[in-house]
Amino acid sequence: MSDDAPVRRPILGILSIVLLFILYRVFAVYTVRSGECRPKAVDPSVRILTRDEAGRVVSFPERSGYPQQQRPLVVMTYNIEGHDELYDGEHAAKIAETIREFKPDIVGLQEVHDHTWQVRFRNQYEEIRRLTGMNGYYGRSYRSLGGDFGNAILTRGQVVSAVVHPLPSIGEPRSVLEAVVRVDGATLNVYVAHLTAWASFNSKSRGVQLECLAKHVRTSRYPYLLLGDFNAPPGSAEVAKFAKEDAAQLCGADIKITHPTLGERIDYIFADWGWRVAGARAIATGASDHYPVIAQLFWSRN
């Protein structure tokens, strides 16, 4: 046997693992099917928003449930990097402190753990909800070694109803949490999503997921907001599907980075056609590997 055999074996082992990973990713990207998307039926009394080729709204949906506002609705989306609780037992408390500081009316949370080993078998959603004093709902995306992993919504108002919709994906399951929320006498549909990661490897998968999200939001009875970590920058083909609903673009806010490690903006607040966005920004805080994004909105189609 050659003297360099002990050296070659670990190298071949590493190369085999890398090859298997690449094959898995290729399989995931090119076998995802949009047919797995099952949005609820459209209410026949709701006309669907359409746009011409120039992007102008040519047909307005009938939205109900929103009274005249005395102040802006403050909305936040926040990927909380829930697994960091394993290394920092105060992680959930730091997330809650950030939320309390900015006093949002509605918060969409991603990467929330419920009794997984990564959070020391604690109920992360309940802990954050209790520390913020808000109401809410947790929606599981998948089971993880006896615990759950998913998205959550918090609100200063009330969650009237909520449902989890699976998103088309292969590998780690993804979902969107849909909730009907009532706050300050107003009723709206809020969607919280976390799309497939792994950069350009899964751009096709994210594109299919965003097509599915577009179908879901079009069924909204009330003014809607779509919040989440979309794992793609603004210039990507997949995010372009919602570019005209981007709260930051609607108010001219220059949000460059929401994930400082990647140096990219991948977290968004997308707003229904009738929202006027008074302001939006990313909040540079170190509680998570993502920055929370916050926006102030007025409903303008009363």
List each language-model region with its residue ranges.
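Residue-level detector of structured alpha->beta connecting loops
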Residues: K103, G133, R156-Q158, R221, ...
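Metal-dependent phosphoester-hydrolase catalytic domains
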Residues: D4-L15, Y24-S64, V164, K215-L225, ...
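Active-site-proximal beta-strand/loop segments in catalytic clefts of secreted hydrolases
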Residues: Y78-E81, Q110-V112, G139-Y142, T155-G157, ...
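Acidic/histidine-rich helix-loop elements
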Residues: I48-T50, P72-A93, H113-W117, T196-S205
